[in-house]
Amino acid sequence: MIAPPYEAPRKGRVRLLVLGLLGLLAAWAAWQAITWPDVSALAEEDPETTAFIERYRDGGWLGLGQDREVEWKWVPGSRISSNLKRAVIVSEDIEFFSHNGFSTREQRAALEDAWEEKKQPRGASTITQQLAKNLWLSPSRNPLRKVKEAVLTWQLERALTKRRILEIYLNVVEFGEGIYGAEAAARHYYGKSARSLTVRQAAELAAGLPRPRSWHPGSKSRSYQRKVRSIERRMAKASWLRRRV
């Protein structure tokens, strides 16, 4: 039986489409390989900037296309209060010292918080996942970005110690508009160094991490104040953390 004459051109178009898609995929993979960050270098070197800081600095959040002032000062982990380390861990990632970069418990906690506050669930990322996003990625939730985040998280967990991951995270995470890192936050809100933060102050800073532009020390939000008190209670219960940080 002779095939209808239109089938051959159709097969040819499909073949060209498949080859084109494969070519695009290969080009994307090659570009990722060329631009992929050297994660292992962070074991010894402090990052000079982050994707989130640069995005804010050039007005990327609002498409302003202009330089914006950033408050940021790097300090060693030894100069960051253990109160803040404990507050951030109980608030953001209680399994930080035991997981491999990913945690289903954080996903459950996000849903519980959303139910309590009657709001959409917050992000359920671990500290390591948040660090990968802050250092190299964007706030976008598209699938390719999430895949890249997962790979970078896996690499961070294998290249760095937990203490180093926490040190970098606390130095680059946003604590308010244009305020990055524990030292800048402590000086901006309390006029003191990060090593001198009290339990209450640490809880206030940690409570703002999910929404740093609206939740920060001085915020009158009832949800924020409840979060602060909740973190203080969790810190009191998690006495075992004192031996880890």
Question: Which residues are covered by each model-predicted region?
Answer:
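Juxtamembrane regions of bacterial inner-membrane/periplasmic proteins
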Residues: 2-245
